[in-house]
C-alpha cells in the first residue's frame, strides 16, 4: 500500500476508532447508537465509493463497463461476446441497468458500494449491539480489499452473511435462493450453498482440535487442498463452474502468500484458540450460536 493510499486509509480508520468510543459511551449511558452507526456507514460509503482509480478492480471493470450495452442494445443482442462472457449474469445486468440510466463508471462504482453499505446496515443491526465496532473490524480485516479488489465477491459474501438467519431458522429454500442470487455475481457462492450442512452441525472440542491440526499441516506442508474440491465440482458441478472457481481461487489458495506467516494468519489462529479452547479465560460470550462458530471455522480453513 503506497503513501497516497495508506494516509487516507489510516485517517479514516482513526475516525472509525473515535466513533467506536462514542458508541461505547452512548451504550454505557443507555442511549441509542443507531445514528452514530448510520454516520459511520455514510463515511464508509464516501471513502470506499469515491476511491477513484484505487484498487485492482478498476483495471478489471473500467473497460468492461465502457463496452456494456444499454437495456435496448442488450435486448437486441447488440453487445460483444467478450463483455457478456467475462463475468456473471447478475453483474452484467447491473452494468446494463447503470448504463441505461446514463451512469459513468464512477457513479456505477459508488452506487455498487452504496448497496453493499445498505446490506451491511441491516446485517450488523441484526447481529450485534456494537455496530460501529463491527464496521471497524470489517474494514480493517477484509472490507477494503473486498470493495477495492474483489467487487463482485463482496456481493457474494454479503448475501451469504444475510442468508445466515435462514440457516438458524432451518429455511433451506430461502438460504439457497439468496446464495443463488449471490452466484449471479460471483460463482464462489456455490461453496456457500454446499456449506449448508456444515453450518448446521455442532462440533466437539476434539473435532475442533483435529480441524486446527489438519489446517496447520496444510499450511506447514503447503498442501494445495483446493484440488480435492475441484475434482468434485468437475464431476457434479460441470467443468465451466469448476474452471471459474479455480480461476478465482488460484491467487488465494495456490499463492505463496496463503502459506506465509502474516498478521492475519496469526490473529486468526489466536482467535480460533481463544473462541474454542479458552473462552472463559478471554471472556468470550456464551451467546455465540453454532452457525456463527461454524462460519468462523470455515473462514479459518480458507484464510
Where are the regions that the model predicts?
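Alpha-helical transmembrane segments and terminal signal-anchor/GPI-anchor hydrophobic tails
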Residues: 54, 59-62, 196-197, 201-303
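Membrane-interface transmembrane helices that cradle and orient dolichyl/undecaprenyl
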Residues: 160-174
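Transmembrane-helix signature of polytopic, membrane-embedded enzymes
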Residues: 31, 124-140
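Start-transfer (signal-anchor) and selected internal transmembrane alpha helices
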Residues: 1-44
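Membrane-interface alpha helices of multi-pass inner-membrane proteins
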Residues: 143, 174-198
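Transmembrane-helix motifs of polytopic, lipid-linked glycan transferases
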Residues: 111-127
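Short hydrophobic/aromatic helix or loop-helix immediately within or flanking a transmembrane segment
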Residues: 59-67, 74-75, 79-103
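Short acidic/glycine- and proline-prone juxtamembrane loop motifs at membrane-interface regions
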Residues: 148-154
